[in-house]
Amino acid sequence: MNQLDNLKKFSKISADTGDVDLIRTYQIQHATTNPSLILKSPLFTTYLKLFNDAIDYAQKIGGNQNTKITNASDRLIVNIGSEILANISGYISTEIDAQLSFNTDLTIKKAHKLITMYQKKNIDTSRVLIKIAATWEGIQAAEELEKSGIKCNLTLVFSFAQARACAERNIYLISPFIGRIYDWYNQRNLIKTSYINDDPGIQSIKKIYHYYKTYGYNTIIMGASFRRLEQILALSGCDYLTISPHFLKQLYQNTNSVTRQLFPPKTIISHHIPVLDQSEFFQEHNKNQMAVEKLNEGIQQFSIDQQKLHKLLLNNLNVQLQK
């Protein structure tokens, strides 16, 4: 048995890719997408029909240039999400435009629009997770969406304050970014040993895991953003792990055994902990320089890739108009 199948015994695996062929190859149950991954996906081969449909859809709906770009982008991510769902048994995480990360109302509006678009394609939307950056505004939006039956994946989690606020508001799933935490400390020469348990990213997710399981929170933890295979193996037993094609291939080709590393406590503590309010959230989150920098950087990176996707769609909208 390969290492990937061994890992599946202890953690549910999500493919961190928009490439449905790779998802089929590794028989993955869940998948995550974002603008960066969509740009890397086979848009002009496997997904050419889906891409062209998004352009046609935007032209049919009409409106000004910005409206067409937005509609084409939304249609494309729903098209790709629907295609992936046809090849997996679990969830697809569909990301909200990162440029909305600090606007609760617009995030809620966009989420409902995407869910409606999935419904019109006869997709079971209980299998769609709306992916939102874990800003304070994003967490508030997700809380409202969860109340209306829309499951959310709060991404770009770097601080314990983010994780705690999500759990307290019954968010379905969070994605702590292990690799980006590691990067921040490693670039500053703040990691003293190569021992995996001294990895700040591993320490962060273990703290969240222990807290959630100790106090009986139902929010799922999905480890994301890995830099080394050792990081993935060190989190065997985490609820979910979303893994890039590079590491999926390594795990698939490796036959070494996998030992479970994370275990829930035998007893759950029934103890009322006051919910973090806005001022307490920012006070705790802002104590963590890494988390503040990495959250803002992540939003900026996703926003840049969203703009690249918009530019690609605009170019094709203009080409179609010239025909």
UniProtKB/Swiss-Prot annotation:
Catalytic activity annotation: D-sedoheptulose 7-phosphate + D-glyceraldehyde 3-phosphate = D-erythrose 4-phosphate + beta-D-fructose 6-phosphate
Catalytic residues in the record: 131
Lineage top rank: taxon: Bacteria
Short name of one Pfam family: TAL_FSA
EC number(s) from the headed UniProt entry: 2.2.1.2
Subcellular location: Cytoplasm
A Gene Ontology term for the protein's cellular component: cytosol
Pathway named in the protein's UniProt entry: Carbohydrate degradation; pentose phosphate pathway; D-glyceraldehyde 3-phosphate and beta-D-fructose 6-phosphate from D-ribose 5-phosphate and D-xylulose 5-phosphate (non-oxidative stage): step 2/3
UniProt keyword list: Cytoplasm, Pentose shunt, Schiff base, Transferase
Metal-binding is among the record's keywords: no
GO molecular function: transaldolase activity
Enzyme class: transferase
GO biological process terms on file: carbohydrate metabolic process; pentose-phosphate shunt
Major localization class: cytoplasm
PANTHER family according to UniProt: TRANSALDOLASE (PTHR10683), TRANSALDOLASE A (PTHR10683:SF16)
Family as reported in the entry's similarity comment: Belongs to the transaldolase family. Type 1 subfamily.
Subunit structure: Homodimer.
Function, in words: Transaldolase is important for the balance of metabolites in the pentose-phosphate pathway.
Protein name per UniProt: Transaldolase
Species this chain originates from: Blochmanniella floridana
Gene of this entry: tal
